[in-house]
């Protein structure tokens, strides 16, 4: 899903969707919701790697007063934390789906950009040409998504997640998922937790301010 999301963002930059602020901002909100939902889903197996991943992230959020106590249900990652994460992981995809419909509405409201860069009276009709291509692409993505969801969860997960949680033993290295690597690199580079969080937040919001 994140591979397709990053491709979609690059396509939007190439086609200058940055100058369609409503479509662009709603897309960035969807991207942020994807990140939060993916992280919460990563924690849900409650294995050794996901537990310590949750510990690291909640420690980062400790720079925001009272947020960690509310999120964890206490002062450490424990059973109330997993219950809160499960509820959020169930709700956030529906929120993202609603914003996807808003995103599509804004796109149809203002129309798409012209990647060819010249004026012409010739228009390619949406039906049946583009609609057929969209349905074909959706079917292909849906098939890949089902295959990954049903058969690829265990092979693509970290072996340490098959180990029962031990709160007294940390993994040799907490390995982030590949789609978190840009944010992980920033947080590793900057010694200050608050500054690292602000820069990660700024990465997502900077394109909102320039749209």
Each model region followed by its residue ranges:
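Membrane-embedded and interfacial regions of multi-pass energy-transducing membrane proteins
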Residues: 1-211
């Amino acid at each position: 899903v994140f591979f397709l999301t990053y491709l979609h963002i690059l396509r939007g930059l190439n086609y200058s969707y940055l100058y369609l602020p409503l479509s662009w901002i709603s897309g960035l909100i969807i991207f942020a919701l994807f990140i939060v939902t993916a992280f919460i889903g990563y924690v849900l197996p409650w294995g050794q790697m996901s537990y310590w991943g949750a510990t690291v992230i909640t420690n980062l959020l400790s720079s925001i007063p009272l947020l960690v106590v509310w999120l964890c249900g206490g002062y450490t990652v424990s059973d109330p934390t997993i219950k809160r994460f499960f509820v959020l992981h169930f709700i956030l995809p529906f929120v993202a789906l609603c914003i996807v419909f808003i995103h599509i509405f804004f796109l149809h409201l203002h129309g798409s950009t012209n990647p060819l860069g010249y004026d012409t009276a010739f228009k390619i009709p949406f039906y049946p040409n583009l609609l057929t291509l969209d349905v074909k692409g959706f079917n292909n993505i849906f098939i890949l998504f089902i295959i990954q969801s049903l058969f690829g969860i265990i092979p693509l997960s970290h072996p340490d997640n098959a180990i029962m949680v031990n709160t007294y033993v940390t993994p040799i290295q907490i390995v982030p998922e590949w789609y978190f690597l840009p944010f992980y690199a920033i947080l590793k580079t900057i010694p200050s937790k608050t500054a690292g969080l602000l820069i990660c937040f700024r990465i997502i919001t900077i394109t909102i301010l320039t749209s």
